[in-house]
């Protein structure tokens, strides 16, 4: 998540108050990078948790992810973003007069099936394999490739 913030030019601060293990909070926000945590009871009410289904992650579909939230308004905004800013209650979409920013981020049907099958069969990486010692990112310089 810090790399995405950097790419988008969003100022961010890392939460140095808690030890990072499996997940970490972005500054003093309600956003968590939970890419390495997927287990029953992990959801945090009133927070947003970003999951990853990439290589080496607990649910290793190979790419993609999800965002957990208990806030319906946030879920509605995120859903619109996933569908090119479209409001799925308006059909045909050409009748929609106002769009929000959208990204066309949604999993394929095949990836959904694969993920559901993996969850049902328990084909998940064990929690210990997800333990990572995060470096102190406050001292890492990100080179943006500009010369």
Language-model features, listed with the residues they occupy:
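Active-site region of PLP-dependent enzymes
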Residues: 36-147
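Conserved PLP phosphate-binding loop immediately N-terminal to the Schiff-base lysine helix
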Residues: 10-52
């Amino acid at each position: 998540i810090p790399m995405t913030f950097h790419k988008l030019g969003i100022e961010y601060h890392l939460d140095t108050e808690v030890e990072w293990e499996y997940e970490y909070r972005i500054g003093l926000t309600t956003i968590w990078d939970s890419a390495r945590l997927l287990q029953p009871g992990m959801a945090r009410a009133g927070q947003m948790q970003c999951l990853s289904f990439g290589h080496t992650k607990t649910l290793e579909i190979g790419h993609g992810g999800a965002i957990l939230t208990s806030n319906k308004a946030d879920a509605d905004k995120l859903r619109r973003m996933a569908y090119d800013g479209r409001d799925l209650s308006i059909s045909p979409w050409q009748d929609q007069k106002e769009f929000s920013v959208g990204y066309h981020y949604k999993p394929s049907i095949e990836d959904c099936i694969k993920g559901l099958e993996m969850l049902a069969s328990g084909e998940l990486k064990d929690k210990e394999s997800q333990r990572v010692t995060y470096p102190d990112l406050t001292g890492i310089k990100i080179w943006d490739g500009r010369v």
